[in-house]
Amino acid sequence: MKVSRRESTRRRHRRVRRTIVGTPARPRLSVFRSNNHIYAQVIDDAAGHTLAAASSLDPDLRQSLTSGGNQQASAAVGKLIAERAQAKGVTTVVFDRGGNLYHGRVKALAEAAREAGLEF
């Protein structure tokens, strides 16, 4: 039986998460991509705490976005998550693409976060 795209994403995510762990010094920038929106969190896996979060559903972005599921929305979320992480004192992170390919919306979020000052 053919493996679905969603199952391929889940397998990649499990494989990636075996090696990527967020520490207090270098937390994990986790990305979740749905059809209509994109979500990002900065997570300290050692403590099990989310340090910062942003999404295309965020009230700060919702009014200015025409759609939550395009590259412009992803770039806006990347910039917002970088600002919120830096406000908490986080400058370097480990990027967790969530099993998604580094292309399109995931790439737009990552590049916007880098431009806004996060290092990874």
From Swiss-Prot:
What GO molecular-function term can you cite, just one? Answer: 5S rRNA binding
Organism superkingdom: Bacteria
Query: Entry's Gene3D superfamilies?
Result: 3.30.420.100
Q: Name one GO biological process term.
A: translation
Q: Name the residues that span the membrane.
A: none
Q: Which HAMAP family match?
A: Ribosomal_uL18_B
Function field: This is one of the proteins that bind and probably mediate the attachment of the 5S RNA into the large ribosomal subunit, where it forms part of the central protuberance.
Descriptive protein name: Large ribosomal subunit protein uL18
Report the source organism: Synechococcus elongatus (strain ATCC 33912 / PCC 7942 / FACHB-805) (Anacystis nidulans R2)
